[in-house]
Amino acid sequence: MELSAFTTCRHELKRPLLIVSGSKGSLACGYLNVATFEKLGEAVAIVRGVNDFDEMCAASVQEISPAAERLGVRPGMTGEEALALMK
């Protein structure tokens, strides 16, 4: 997936902290907590066990916030599918 339409952030820790944000929501790694996004009314889909943005796009969404659910994001879809809904 071409990510030029998104904002990406990578922070090096023992495992990288990764987030890809579109205008409607974000795809994030497991370092981030859905509850925080939920509290703020933000759309997020969480994927786990990823080391780079390509792996994020291919990974299965594990958790979503209610705002992401309203956009049509569902657990089990790929990160790429989730990003298409949050672009």
Model-derived regions, located:
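Residues that scaffold, gate, or flank divalent-cation-dependent active/transport sites
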Residues: 1-87
